[in-house]
From Swiss-Prot:
The keyword Transmembrane does not apply. It catalyses: diphosphate + H2O = 2 phosphate + H(+). Catalyzes the hydrolysis of inorganic pyrophosphate (PPi) forming two phosphate ions. This is Inorganic pyrophosphatase. It comes from the Archaea. NCBIfam families: PRK01250.1. Belongs to the PPase family. One of its GO terms (cellular component) is cytoplasm. Pfam families: Pyrophosphatase (PF00719). One of its GO terms (molecular function) is inorganic diphosphate phosphatase activity. The gene is ppa. It is an enzyme of class 3 (hydrolase). It comes from Nanoarchaeum equitans (strain Kin4-M). Homohexamer. Keywords: Cytoplasm, Hydrolase, Magnesium, Metal-binding.
Length: 160
């Protein structure tokens, strides 16, 4: 499966941007000394149970420009729970034509353990200093589950 990801936050940023009404706006500057370990955004034309598009974390060596689209393939999903309920984040890599290194990865099980630890650590801590907010990391799931979640979110989008 290949989909496009819309990048809101570049790798290495501590500024949380959100795309709203056709514009990229600053949502907030992260409260703690944290920065996004990889590029973060959403998969267009998807809808999660929380009413937002499906979140995606795109693993690359380089930060991508906010507002850009990149063709990716899902390799897994990070399941978290926050103050609003279950929050799933698709973990994706660019397709091989775009990134010949990460493009070879097919499943989250192929990611180096250090990459998964970095992702887990970030999402466990990035809301820690924000009043009334929290995140609990539940588990990583593989490519098949990620693809099921994307297909369901695409169906949800079509039904709205």
């Amino acid at each position: 499966m290949e989909v496009y990801a819309f990048i809101e936050v570049p790798k290495g940023s501590n500024v949380k941007y959100e795309y709203e009404d056709g514009k990229l706006k600053v949502d907030r500057i992260l409260y703690g000394a944290m920065f996004y370990p990889y590029n973060y955004g959403f998969i267009p034309e998807t809808l999660e149970e929380d009413g937002d598009p499906l979140d995606v974390l795109v693993i690359t060596e380089e930060p991508l420009v906010p507002g850009s689209y990149i063709k990716v393939k899902p390799i897994g999903v990070l399941v978290t729970e926050d103050e609003k309920g279950v929050d799933r984040k698709i973990i994706a890599v660019p397709v091989k034509k775009v990134d010949p290194i990460y493009g070879e990865i097919e499943d989250i099980s192929e990611l180096k353990e250090g990459i998964k630890l970095k992702i887990k650590h970030f999402f466990e801590r990035y809301k820690e200093l924000e009043p009334g907010k929290f995140v609990k990391v539940k588990e990583f799931l593989g490519k098949e589950e990620a693809e099921k979640i994307i297909k369901q979110a695409q169906e949800n989008y079509k039904k709205q």
